[in-house]
Amino acid sequence: MLKPKNVIDREDKGEIVEAEGGGTMTKVYCTAIVLAAGSGKRMGTKVHKQYLQLCEKPVLAYSLQAFQQSDLIDEIILVVGKGEEEFCRTEIVEKYGFFKVQKIICGGEQRYHSVWNGLKETKAGYVYIHDGARPFVNENIIRRGYECVVREHACAAGMPVKDTVKIVDDNNIVSQTPERKYVWIV
């Protein structure tokens, strides 16, 4: 979650919300940028990951649903691949009633281009950036992220790796094995 330099508490979005563990906090306008412009080449399927069916629903719909249902999220900006805008509008956004999706925009050549395209469309406030092919985001993650940003001004959701990770040099020779306790995936 990013905090742009022009963060303001909007008059119409300054409601008080409960904080985890008790207490309250003033709600700042929040935008979720959901990235769904990837082609999933590494996966090797004909259908992009975000559109694969999971329990009869596209994977992307689960990500959108979590942000749609969160009282912390005011709007969603959906970033999709070129030419997929209308498909996403009709087959996902309208079909599943994701009314918080305010804009469907085209992604860029690389992930960071897609993020930048989304950021250019946001209003002032806090911004969540989420990979639409990761369907297991939930209210707890969203709320904890919000609380972390209020305290620390930036945050990334992640978890420790379970696998052994190796660092290689330019010749693909293992040069290091970092301790797992220092390696997280985000």
PLM-predicted stretches and their roles:
Residues K27-E85:
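N-terminal glycine-rich phosphate-binding loop and ensuing alpha1 helix
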Residues E86-I92:
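Acidic helix N-cap motif at the loop->helix transition within catalytic regions
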Residues G97-E109:
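Conserved donor nucleotide-binding strand/loop of the catalytic core
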Residues R111-V115:
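Conserved donor sugar-nucleotide recognition element shared by glycan-biosynthetic enzymes
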Residues W116-Y126:
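Active-site nucleotide-sugar/metal-binding loop of Leloir-type enzymes
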Residues G125-A133:
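Short beta-strand-to-loop acidic/aromatic patch adjacent to the donor-nucleotide binding site
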